[in-house]
Regions:
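Amphipathic, Lys/Arg- and hydrophobic-enriched alpha-helical face
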Residues: 29-47, 64, 131, 183
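Structural recognition of an alpha-helix C-terminal capping motif at a helix-to-coil junction
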Residues: 38, 52-59, 72-84
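Internal acidic/polar
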Residues: 6-7, 96-124
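Sigma70-family region 2
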Residues: 18-19, 42-45, 55-73, 92-94
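DNA-recognition helix of helix-turn-helix
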Residues: 87, 138, 147, 157-184
Length: 190
């Protein structure tokens, strides 16, 4: 939670950005770079791709500041704009993947290892790295559902897929991540 002082500083920068002051844009960019980069990394296949998404996101933020209503949380508004920019980027540069490989993976049984214990032993960076290994569409559905709180209906509308396809991607992503986490845990305990 941000302090009143912090909120006042951000509100001042937003007002200055609306007046076209590039110095304020630079301050806003520097201040929110890390948290917005983290948002983009959830949807990107690499840090370079996340950087591209982030740049497009900030461009949309600065272009649409007149649409931000000062009554709400600026960071929540910015996060939504950056998330949508990342999704637009993903659609624009969508990568194809082999459906048969994903179907085989979804049907692979998972060994009897304590999954929750395995997750608890992992760092956030390790979890992000595993999520980034998911195919683009699967990663996008997973992030929207788990991190952004979208429903399958909202995901379907956003990505132009059916709700059942969204659910399939989420289930397959969970199974794949679970398998990889258990595999990593086995390697860590050896």
């Amino acid at each position: 939670m941000m302090s009143e002082r912090e909120n006042a500083k951000i509100a001042r920068w937003v007002d200055e950005c609306r007046q076209g002051r590039t110095r304020a844009q630079h301050k806003l960019f520097r201040h929110f770079y890390a948290p917005m980069f983290s948002v983009c990394m959830r949807y990107a296949g690499s840090p370079e791709e996340a950087e591209d998404m982030l740049n497009e996101g900030f461009l949309k933020v600065f272009s649409n500041l007149d649409k931000y209503e000062d009554t709400g949380s600026f960071i929540a508004w910015m996060r939504k704009v950056v998330t949508n920019a990342a999704l637009d980027y993903r659609r624009k540069y969508a990568m194809k993947f082999e459906t048969t490989e994903l179907e085989q993976l979804a049907n692979t049984p998972i060994a009897g290892v304590d999954y929750n214990q395995a997750v608890a032993q992992m760092s956030a960076d390790e979890l992000v790295a595993l999520i980034q290994q998911l195919p683009p569409m699967m990663r996008t559905v997973f992030n929207l559902f788990i991190f952004e709180g979208y429903s399958h209906a909202e995901i379907a509308a956003q990505l132009d897929i059916t709700e059942s396809t969204s659910a399939w991607h989420l289930n397959t992503a969970r199974n794949r991540l679970k398998k990889e986490i258990i595999k990593m845990n086995g390697e860590l305990t050896k």
